[in-house]
UniProtKB/Swiss-Prot annotation:
Superkingdom of origin: Bacteria
GO CC annotations on file: ATP-binding cassette (ABC) transporter complex
UniProt topology in membrane: Peripheral membrane protein
UniProt-listed SMART domains: AAA
Top enzyme category: translocase
Occurrences of domain ABC transporter (ranges): 2-237
Protein name per UniProt: Putative ABC transporter ATP-binding protein lin1170
EC code: 7.-.-.-
InterPro entries recorded: AAA+_ATPase, ABC_transporter-like_ATP-bd, ABC_transporter-like_CS, ABC_transpr_CbiO/EcfA_su, Co_trans_ATP-bd, ECF_ABC_transporter_ATP-bd, P-loop_NTPase
Binding site residues for ATP: G35, A36, N37, G38, S39, G40, K41, S42
Compartments, record wording: Cell membrane
Amino acid sequence: MLKTEHISFQYEDGKQALTDVSIDLDKGNIIGLIGANGSGKSTLFMQLLGINRPTSGTVYFEGKPLAYNKKALFALRKKVSIVFQDPDQQIFYSNVRDDVAFALRNLGISEKEVESRVTNVLETVGATEFQHKPVQYLSYGQKKRVAIAGALVLDTDWLLLDEPTAGLDPIGKKIMMEIIERLAKQGKKILISSHDIDLIYEICDYVYMLKDGTVLTSGETSEVFLEKSHIEQAGLVQPWLIKLHQQAGYPLFKKEADFFAHTGKVIN
């Protein structure tokens, strides 16, 4: 269990970044965190990782208030990992396999176990075809997959993804969505922070919407996005499938593929 209860956070310069924020990562298998720039998404990620301590309120981990000592933070980070928007922030080696194996080797895990786990996660993210390729020759999307593999190899329960589809072409976005859904089916709890509203709508089963460091609204994905007034308050736009439903009278579809399957049947 990982959640926050009424946390607020103020930076040293006096800027109030979060105010009375409560979120529960057990609300869904893939949870979306949305809001305009400066709404507090990145700050909240740092709270969930124990990097920043709330000014007030509590972060709960495995049913207990998080203690900010070395032992407690080590236990937290064995269960919670993050993949940053820019994969170059997380890739340190020129060789893909060595980079993914880096954390495991630092922990002193046997080389046999390291090789097995690295192979498994590279298969999970579809990176085996370029596992021996120098990192500098990888595409941006391939680097993103390597960064995810580096987080997955630690076998954490929760995965925090910061803008996972940013900078990707349509094929890269499709591959990333498939990876995220595959991980959720394998039992990972995933929190996605993104400006890609269509991604959040299609892939998430629960959403938290932030505005100026507070939770403006939360709920099941369709429920949140159908409330246009909240979307506008947050400085966001509705997903295109929601717009089709509300403005053109189409049935409410969750997936793009479902919409095109429906229209194909109608045309035929």
